[in-house]
Amino acid sequence: MSDNDDIEVESDEDSSRFPYSADKRAHHNALERKRRDHIKDSFHGLRDSVPSLQGEKASRAQILDKATEYIQYMRRKNHTHQQDIDDLKRQNALLEQQVQISNPKPPSNGAPEQKNVLQLLSPSKVRALEKAKSSSQLQSNYSSSESETEEPQSRKKLRMDAS
């Protein structure tokens, strides 16, 4: 054997693979950077969606904890509002029955029909009033959500009336 057998010579095949693997690595790094940026942007969006974290610096763990608390709070609030809606529907049905009992048939003398008080408000006005009330109470209720255990007086009255 000669001394030339121990020398490794770079072939054209080896040199052509090196740039490909560098390109592949660079492409992978770019994709990974894009993925990390997307996760970072998503956490920023989540942070900005939680009222108690808006504009604050917070770790990802804090963002997830506060977001979880806020979601639970909103679910409780949504459930309470749904109960209020159901109570109001029941009260509305009772009032409609009382109106039917007190006015069994429309006047036949050609006089205009009496309007139900509930029909006087347009649905858009009712929604606007509900939205204004809920948005003004949202921030104050969210900050004191842990102490929110007592049922509102209006619902207590409705529940007692329905019994």
Curated annotation (Swiss-Prot):
Main location: nucleus
Keyword Metal-binding set for record: no
Record carries keyword Transcription: yes
Sequence segments annotated as region (Disordered): 1-40, 98-117, 128-163
GO terms (BP aspect): positive regulation of transcription by RNA polymerase II
Subcellular location: Nucleus
Domain bHLH stretches: 23-74
Expression by tissue: All four alternatively spliced forms are present during development and in all adult tissues examined.
Keyword annotations: Activator, DNA-binding, Nucleus, Phosphoprotein, Repressor, Transcription, Transcription regulation
A single cellular component GO annotation: MLL1 complex
Quaternary state and interactors: Efficient DNA binding requires dimerization with another bHLH protein. MYC/MAX heterodimers bind to target DNA with high affinity. MAX may also form homodimers which recognize the same target sequence, but which are unable to function as transcription activators. Component of some MLL1/MLL complex.
Classification via PANTHER family: PROTEIN MAX, PROTEIN MAX MYC-ASSOCIATED FACTOR X
Name assigned to this protein: Protein max
Lineage, top ranks: Eukaryota, Metazoa, Chordata, Craniata, Vertebrata
Gene: max
